[in-house]
Amino acid sequence: MIIDSHAHYNNNAYKKPFRYLTRNADGYALKEGDREQLFRELLETDIPYSIEPGVSLQSCDEVLILASEYPGRIFPTIGIHPTRSIFEKWSDRHKLAAFARKPGVIAIGEIGLDYHYKREEQHRMKQHLWFVYQLNLAWKLKLPVILHVRDAHEDALRILKWHPARKLGGVIHCFYGSREIAEQYLKLGYHFGIGGSILQLEERAKDLWGAIPIIPLERILVETDAPFILPYCKDVIQPKLLRRARNTSLILPAVIEKIAQLKGVSVDSVEQATTLNTVHLFSLPVEITPKAE
């Protein structure tokens, strides 16, 4: 059994029939369908659960609705993404706290800092304001966090080192940093969300490939960030067909296989460990049945 620790199935990309990525004997293939069909396929391929992070006040409402439509399969988290925080009113922060207190919410996220895009200085200040507020909320509610940190590790680590919320644990979502950065998050006790970034060509993935061997297996979760971060598959699928194609949890076996290769361990051991890690970190109400020998 595999759990997708980070997907956005409430995204508009899944609200009408769509083209999506799956796997076949050649590696990858495209299919046409809708979200209900995709969720049936995930159930059939033993990828029954996913964690659905909020990224804005509107999406927090949407993830709670989606979780109510798929009880016991979709687990909601509440948060404001750093790049969305500049569009939210600070006076509306009480709405976020109200969402976070809803039954079934398992974490605060995704939250953090993102300096990838050029921003005015006041935008970074607003990111910091929301980040610390949401860490405070996580600490108050005793919930782990899902962290989004891009091109901002120095500032994020400085905040995380002094904030008590680090004691509750969390995951660095979509990690693709170097060994040196991984070591700093390891010292703070965080987990690492590994997804499509590990399935890119070497020139793009070499830092992450170098970091994976030093990250203990008990600190790794697998994720997709669907519908985003497609694996490299232009060698088997025409690039023009990949336009507007959605990523899905169906690629997770490939992520697990690559982690196993880089760590020199069995695929089964990675699958079992990452599933257990996800269940334990987020206290998921999921029963894990060991694979038959």
Question: Where are the regions a protein language model picked out?
Answer:
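Mid-domain alpha/beta scaffold segments of enzyme catalytic cores
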Residues: 1-293
